[in-house]
Amino acid sequence: MMEADRPEKLFVGGLNLKTDEKALKAEFGKYGHIIKVFLIKDRKTNKSRGFAFVTFESPADAKAAARDMNGKYLDGKAIMVAQTIKPAFESSRWVPPTPGSGSRSRFSHRTRGGGSSPQRPPSQGRPDDGRGYVGYFDLWPYRAPMPRKRGPPPRHCASPPHKRRDPGDFVPALREYSRRYYGHSSVPDYCPXRGDGNRNGYRGRDHDYMDHPSKGSYREPLKSYGGPCGAAPVRGTPPSYGGGCCYEEYQGNSPDACSEGRSSEALPVVLPDAYSRDHLPKAYSGGRSSSSNSYSRSDRYGEEGCYEEYRGRSPDAHSGGRNSSSNSYGQSHHYGGEGRYEEYRGRYEEYRGRSHEARSGGRSTDAHSGGRSDNAYSGGHDSSSWSDCCGGGGRYEEYQGRSLDANSGGRSPEAYSGGHDNSSWSDRYGVGGHYEENRGHSLDANSGGRSPDTHSGGRSSSSNSYGQSHRYGGEGHYEYRGRSHDAHSGGCSADAYSGGHDSSSRSHRYRGGGRYVEYRGRSLDANSGGCWPDAYSGGHDSSSQSYRYRGGGCYEEYRGRSLDANSGGRSPNAYSGGHDSSSRSHRYGGGGCYEEYRGRSLDANSGGRWPDAYSGGHDSSSQSNRYGGGGCYEEYRGRSLDANSGGCSPNAYSGGHDSSSQSHRYGGGGRSLDANSGGRSPDAYSGGHDSSSQSNRYGGGSRYEEYRGRSLDANSSGRLPDAYSGGHDSSSWSHRYGGGGRYEEYRGRSLDANSGGRSPNAYSGGRDSSSNSYDRSHRYGGGGHYEEYRGRSHDTHSRGQSPDAHSGDRSTEAYSRGRNSFSNSYGQSDHYGRGGRYEEYQGRSPDAYGGGRGLNSSNNSHGRSHRYGGGGRYEEYRGPSPDAHSGGHDSSIKSYGLSDRYGGGGHYEEYQGSLPDAYSGDHDRSSNSYGRSDRYSRGRDRVGRPDRGLPLPMETGSPPLHDSYSRSGCRVPRGGGRQGGRFERGEGQSRY
């Protein structure tokens, strides 16, 4: 009779000798909470013996694990998993050894014909010590005395006694298991051989492991079980571990205790009492095969299914630049739901070795090294272990490998964290864990490419690590308490981040109850290119006490000298020139007012050549729940996010690499967020491809195609004057912030003037845009007015060649190339909602839209409209005069038509023409023109009159039409009889 003695306890056999406790816990942990993982090791060598015990908290979890894992491959070897069982015999009495009965084993065997010594009660032998688990692995430390004198073994196989149960009841064919897991059977059908026990038994090589009356032996002869001639051991009941097979430890002489089985001599195993307190687990991988570093199967973000992330065994871009075919991610519910998500499944090799590819610019064997190293990403280590990343009860080890983005400006292969673990286990945004974020060498490697472990200047910032806390919830303490050398000094200062002070007091960062003093120290990221130790706020308190995004308090954001000190190592006050760049307000909610970005510039992305450049090598803010809620806001999308090359490299973002490939980054099915091409293509961001496909980025029910154009942040390596999108639409339909409308973001020449400092229409130019700042308003809601960009003073948008922002010239005020732009200013309106009107750019003087030719652009002015909603019309840029979109030519045919730009039922005709313009770098980009359509909605045609039988505007070979929106007043309908058609980008041949 057999029964599960401890159903929560599993026996795991057939293990690879390189598999350690951590790998076992990772692999089995997905089935439930594990109390203990006990890997059997050799006492002398402390090496694995190839089997282990895993104890779950729940027997049901253990049963599920045994069912699923039995026969699966772990680190290249098929393993056996079974619940430990208790063999129950009709007699529970222990049988002492038969005097004079020697054998190969140290233990005597009863035979059918032979007698046995009188039985003694359990109290005299190996007792059942309350655990009820009696087996050959539990004989330690209790041993009955062994006779000193050994007699000759039996001459033949004796039949078992009549009360002896068939060994198959508790030890199924051992040969079957050993053949399956070790290549051939090492358990022959045999009778105990003749000979002296001292020569044939365990005395020879392992004589020191002979039995002792006081201590007992810790080895068991596995040959004693399961053979047709084998009898029950007289000193204990035979063990079994369920699952239809008995585990046989490899008995050969090979160092690999689980590999071949060339010898019949059993190797020792160490089984300390109560599952070992003596032996520590082996190191994780140390840069070797990442098979044991693989992610376990788990519901990473959800509840059902299995997640096999990074389960292979060979190193790849994550582990040293070798074959990543087996490192692919397996099936999983990545973020929940019911289907299976296979991320990096099969033979997808991202950063796959030595082939030239767009991400490495043809130089590198992997992506993140900037073309110089083949192990930039994780240096052979596992860069993320198993977890429930954003929920549940798991633990999250984020970015354990050497680097995240290898953002070292292309100079170091270990830019990110220098091979250290920069994030320990935690529920990152969840409930009960601790979060220690950024413990390693660096967070963003923002040292301008001067140090091998870029962020910390070659030193260890581990003591600066965040303390235990619930970062976004709970009641712990928060972050960055140390004072030693850390990442933000660029290798120059020992106290770059907080000047030796506690840069964040106790608080609930985004939750109620506490106060949050954020970035009180000298700097946030010391993004000064390694030149200034106080890059962030010049030693001032850059954030007063507040609830950052929650109700009740006031928020003074970025009061210090700068936001990110992204000065490329030239200026300590890059962002706001020492002024308060944000007054008190509830930023996006409540009843206050918000003055956003009053300082010098918003991004000042001038390519790292101006003292107040945004990205000259730095960035302190990556993706986060900046504004709360369920979405994520990616801030600072200038030249680079993390790997700002220090103003030295044209591949500003991450050295030509994508640190997030195919995935649902924020939900949906997008491809990638930052697939940078290595700075060799004028469309540096995504190589002309759509780097983020359909998804609901921030919610809603529509699709968001973000960054569809050539680049997001003018990642053109400084080669094109149309740095932003290279003539394409870099953001298509979407519900950016939710709701039912659609939002087209960043359609202009560039967002951040990311032209590498070579274009006259650069965004940031390095001038003061404080007077051009946004006025007080409820930017995204409420009932106030929104006056956008009214000023006339010198600002950042001219790239240092003109005192104004949008003109790219030398005029004295921002918008109109030297003329009075008061009339060009935006009128009062509800910019994004409710019942007001939006008068955008109503004036009549020469302006930025007029190309500086001095012509009257009154007809170019925007008409009254609800720009993003309501029932009005939007007349954007109707006139015939030269303008910024046409490179000084007549763009009347490119003018925008009457329409509700973001709502209503009209058509939106955007940029249909064929003339050289800011989008095309002075080349003919007719195929890039936008077609007439309802770009953002369906509905009634408000462009022209009913159908006149003309072909659709985007049809190839259509005859050119008149300028329907020129001053001649000619209104030629362009709908072809189709009312409310959806907008489609003119990727092919355009009629204009």
From Swiss-Prot:
InterPro entries on file: Nucleotide-bd_a/b_plait_sf, RBD_domain_sf, RBM, RRM_dom, RRM_dom_euk
Q: Answer whether the UniProt record assigns the keyword RNA-binding to this protein.
A: yes
SUPFAM superfamilies, per this entry? RNA-binding domain, RBD (SSF54928)
List every stretch annotated Disordered. 91-130, 144-169, 188-207, 278-385, 397-511, 562-588, 644-992
Compositional bias (Low complexity) = 284-296, 318-334, 454-471
Output compositional bias ranges, type Basic and acidic residues. Answer: 297-316, 335-371, 472-488, 785-798, 831-842, 920-948, 981-992
Instruction: Name the PANTHER family for this protein.
Output: TRANSFORMER-2 SEX-DETERMINING PROTEIN-RELATED (PTHR48034)
Q: What is this protein called?
A: RNA-binding motif protein, X-linked-like-3
Which species is this record about? Answer: Pan troglodytes
